[in-house]
Amino acid sequence: MNKKILVVDDEESIVTLLQYNLERSGYDVITASDGEEALKKAETEKPDLIVLDVMLPKLDGIEVCKQLRQQKLMFPILMLTAKDEEFDKVLGLELGADDYMTKPFSPREVNARVKAILRRSEIAAPSSEMKNDEMEGQIVIGDLKILPDHYEAYFKESQLELTPKEFELLLYLGRHKGRVLTRDLLLSAVWNYDFAGDTRIVDVHISHLRDKIENNTKKPIYIKTIRGLGYKLEEPKMNE
């Protein structure tokens, strides 16, 4: 079955261009031209990925992203912005977008991003043949449990609501427990490209993870900042 992509943009020429190129690459494409229509189609069509413009009528892309995440709809979101402004990019990522691109862009570049995001989601997604009691490869760090084969993570026995990118980052940290990982390394390993050196993307996602597993985000005991270097995930110490 072909993967389904929801393309949301109020510029008809961009929608037509993206739809044509994505369909040529073998995807089923549905479209929306405003934020309200995007929310409705996301809820009813359950796409595998959304290509979402920031500047939209009725509801902008930032609000659409926010509402989708509030409804626990965790499919990947690739945001498009005509503004080369850090505010748009960082805010979108803070609200749960997985990736962004700045206009103008080439259709080939969009196809490459879509393919990479879907491939990572597919690799991380649980197999339909997986039994519930299969826990091979689980990573346990204090009260945190990561189940790579099930694409799930738990903290104090409660399942965490994570976006695909948050899970991939947590999993990479967990697989390298106790190691200091630079922001550049995390960009390369989790995002597969360097975002032109924009390491704030890592910081935003680390902040999201801390919100979900740290009792005090100002004094984290799991995900530690190593000043001037990066981050590491470690076992909490008894006196912390």
UniProtKB/Swiss-Prot annotation:
One Pfam family matching this protein: Trans_reg_C
Alphabetical keyword list: Activator, Cytoplasm, DNA-binding, Phosphate transport, Phosphoprotein, Transcription, Transcription regulation, Transport, Two-component regulatory system
GO cellular component: a single term: cytosol
GO terms, molecular function: phosphorelay response regulator activity; transcription cis-regulatory region binding
DNA-binding region: 136-235
Modified residues (4-aspartylphosphate): D53
Subcellular location: Cytoplasm
InterPro entries reported in the protein's UniProt record: CheY-like_superfamily, OmpR/PhoB-type_DNA-bd, Sig_transdc_resp-reg_C-effctor, Sig_transdc_resp-reg_receiver, WalR-like, WH-like_DNA-bd_sf
SUPFAM superfamilies xref list: C-terminal effector domain of the bipartite response regulators, CheY-like
Residue ranges of every copy of the Response regulatory domain listed in the record: 4-118
Cross-referenced Gene3D superfamilies: 3.40.50.2300, 6.10.250.690, Winged helix-like DNA-binding domain superfamily/Winged helix DNA-binding domain
GO biological process: phosphate ion transport; regulation of DNA-templated transcription
Reported function: Member of the two-component regulatory system PhoP/PhoR involved in the regulation of alkaline phosphatase genes phoA and phoB and of phosphodiesterase.
UniProt xrefs under PANTHER family: ALKALINE PHOSPHATASE SYNTHESIS TRANSCRIPTIONAL REGULATORY PROTEIN PHOP (PTHR48111:SF73), REGULATOR OF RPOS (PTHR48111)
Name of protein: Alkaline phosphatase synthesis transcriptional regulatory protein PhoP
The organism of origin for this protein: Bacillus subtilis (strain 168)
